[in-house]
Design a protein with these regions (language model features):
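Short, flexible loop segments at the rims of nucleotide/cofactor-binding pockets, characterized by
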Residues: 3-7, 183, 313
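Signature of N6-adenine DNA methyltransferases within the class I
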Residues: 1-151, 223-228, 236-240, 263-270
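Polybasic, glycine- and aromatic-enriched phosphate-binding surface used to engage nucleic acids
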Residues: 11, 18-21, 118-285
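Generic beta-strand/beta-sheet core signal
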Residues: 30, 60, 77, 207-209, ...
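A generic secondary-structure signal for well-formed alpha-helical elements
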Residues: 21, 25, 35-38, 51-56, ...
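Alpha-helix boundary recognition
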Residues: 48-50, 166, 248, 346
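Non-catalytic DNA-recognition/assembly elements of restriction-modification systems
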Residues: 102-149, 161, 167-170, 277-356
Length: 356
């Protein structure tokens, strides 16, 4: 039953309505879009999957004035053969399509936002051969929750303070120059992970609240605030910088965006991204390019009076883009993504395509 502590009232209405229907009976409700994949709605998804099929979904966006809650119209048909979505009509962003490839309705999510082409490619990528996962092979840590940032976080580095990384400082492959400082005594704060996780010889830092996967490398044992979290991979034979490149790739972003449609990067999202097992030479090729992106300043060359002069610049965006594209092309081939599929991925992703 969907009733219980912390219950969503919309879930109770759906459950009661399904009980009143006979087979082939139809119901339609305006519901929060979160019903499709947010954990709080897991029980009602189970109930729907065990008693009905989806026949139509109309995505409404933020339909109610002054309320930030994307909504949808969900039409269900009670069935003795429940748990299917084949034949469902989907209306979204001014277009309409029919689900031709059945997507079994599961308790974790209802994959009803995607076209058949998007869904098939997602499933193929997720089932790439010879992959490892971070589930059970990584340490995770949340950033520090001070309980009072105005009191504990400063824009000036006072005596005994040290730099702390915030989500705004994190870009793909690198952390920008931070302008926040705090005391390293973790007992001062409301919530913090064990100090040894922040002080690990190397770790990955990622933006927590973001529609994109943005991972940076840190080997300076820096603290992080709760707008960015920490993951320390331990997959045998795979370099941490290589894993960072995988997580920063368009293929990983495609999985995250299409599978979860989330605004917060959760541990479970990261753990479920397949990481191809690459040979040492391939890892070296990727890491050598990644290390250039990790630098706060890039080394470029220009011709001055017919002589080659080396200089530093932190503004050479074109060079960063080129390096990202070179890495990304190697990564997508590890997933056996064809040229046509790769172009499809590029066209279907939203948001800033680089975040460098």
């Amino acid at each position: 039953t969907a009733a219980g502590r912390g219950v969503e009232s919309s879930d109770v209405f759906v459950e009661c309505a399904l009980k009143l229907l006979t087979d082939e009976g139809v119901l339609a409700f305006v519901l929060p879009e979160a019903l499709l994949d947010v954990h709080n709605h897991k029980t009602i998804r189970e109930i729907i999957a065990e008693s009905a099929n989806v026949s139509r979904v109309s995505f409404l966006g933020d339909a109610f004035y002054g309320v930030q809650c994307p909504s949808l119209v969900l039409q269900l048909e009670k069935s003795s053969d429940p748990g299917h979505s084949k034949g469902a009509v989907i209306e979204r962003d001014g277009r309409e399509f029919v689900v031709g490839t059945d997507r079994p309705l599961g308790s974790e999510n209802f994959m009803l936002r995607l076209t058949d082409d998007e869904y098939r490619l997602l499933c193929r990528i997720e089932n790439t051969d010879n992959c490892e996962f971070l589930r059970g092979q990584a340490d995770f840590a949340l950033g520090i929750v001070t309980g009072d940032n105005a009191k504990y976080v400063s824009t000036e580095c006072g005596e005994g303070m040290e730099a702390v990384i915030t989500g705004a400082d994190v870009y793909r492959y690198r952390c920008g120059k931070t302008e926040k400082y705090m005391y390293p005594e973790l007992t001062l704060y409301q919530q913090a992970a064990p100090l040894e996780l922040y002080r690990a010889p190397e770790k990955l830092i990622y933006r927590f609240i973001n529609r994109q996967l943005v991972f940076a490398y840190d080997d300076r044992q820096r603290l992080t605030l709760n707008s960015c979290n920490v993951v320390i991979p331990h997959i045998p034979g795979l370099d941490m910088r290589y894993i960072m490149a995988i997580l920063n790739s368009r293929v990983a972003q495609y999985i995250y965006e299409k599978r979860y449609n989330a605004v917060k990067v959760l541990r479970s999202h990261i753990e479920n991204i397949p990481v191809p097992v690459a040979d040492e030479e391939t890892q070296r090729r990727i890491i050598s390019k990644a290390e250039e992106l990790m630098a706060e300043e890039l080394i470029t060359e220009s011709s001055v009076n017919s002589e080659m002069q080396t200089y530093k610049t932190g503004k050479d965006h074109l060079q960063r883009y080129r390096l990202y594209e070179e890495i990304d092309d190697i990564v997508r081939k590890l997933y056996s993504v064809t040229d046509e599929e790769y172009e499809f991925i590029k066209q279907s992703l939203s948001g800033d395509k680089y975040m460098l």
